[in-house]
Each structure stands twice: as C-alpha cells, then as structure tokens.
Regions:
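A generic short-segment signal for beta-strand/edge and adjacent turn/coil regions
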Residues: 10-13, 41, 88-94
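Short, structured secondary-structure boundary patches
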Residues: 1, 35-38, 97
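Glycine-rich phosphate/diphosphate-binding loop of Rossmann-like nucleotide-binding domains
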Residues: 1-8
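ADP-ribose/adenylate-binding Rossmann-like module
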Residues: 12-75
C-alpha cells in the first residue's frame, strides 16, 4: 500500500529489482500506473526480465521500447548503462573516491572508523573474522 501511494505521487519512478535466476518481481502494477499523474515516467531497468521475458518490474514495460500507457511514459531500454557509460564510470569513480576519503586519513593511512555507519556497513572482514556474508 505504501509503494502504491508513493508511485501515485512520483513524477519519476526508477525500478531496478532483479532476482538472479528468476523473473523480475512486479513492483509497479497497471493499476499503479493508472494512478500516476499524466506525463510521469517509469524507467524500468528490469525490462525484458519479467515473466516469460515480457515486462519487467512493471508488466506494461515493452523491451527496448519507450511507450506511453495511461499517460505515463515507460522506458524499457535493456542496455541503458551502455548508453551512459562515461557518466556511469565518472559517477562510480566519484563514489569510490568519496568512500576512500572515509577510510584513509589526511596522512594517507588506512583508518577504519566503525562509528561511521557507511564504513561499518561495508566492512566484510576484520581481524581474520568474516563480519558479513
């Protein structure tokens, strides 16, 4: 119910949910699309991975097509990252740099601050112990 409420209020919805080896889950139903404001956009990054290779996180998504249904534009591009490779690389590099600033102090020494929520959540091993699987 909360997702439906948020979708109805949104101008843009970007869905990315995929489960390896299974069809993409339906997160945005046709009824939810009908509730959206005219001119809204859904970018379905799970396009072509729905049941029987049709749809994505929204069953109205058409693989490798941009279509308008119920006044809402649905983008079903299956290779969107390749279209923005330079931007995606720059964004990734910036995120890595920002993370490194959290774990390397001004003297260039590795410093793991477990009080920092981001650092703590990213710590996989410590002192020979696996912290997360």
């Amino acid at each position: 119910a909360e997702v439906a409420k948020r979708v109805a209020q949104a101008d843009v919805v970007i869905s990315t949910a995929l489960i390896p080896g299974r069809a993409a889950p339906v997160l945005v139903t046709e009824e939810m699309v009908k509730s959206m404001k005219p001119g809204s956009v859904i970018v379905d990054l799970a396009a072509g991975k729905g049941a029987n290779g049709v749809g994505g996180n929204c069953p109205l998504t058409e693989t490798d097509q941009t279509v308008v249904k119920h006044g809402v534009t649905l983008v079903g591009d299956t290779n969107l990252p390749a279209r923005v490779a330079a931007d995606a690389s720059a964004l990734y590099a910036r995120n890595v740099l920002d993370f490194l600033k959290l774990v390397v102090n001004k003297e260039g020494v590795l410093h793991i601050d477990l009080e920092d929520d981001i650092v703590a959540a990213c710590l996989m091993t410590q002192g020979g112990e696996v912290k997360r699987k």
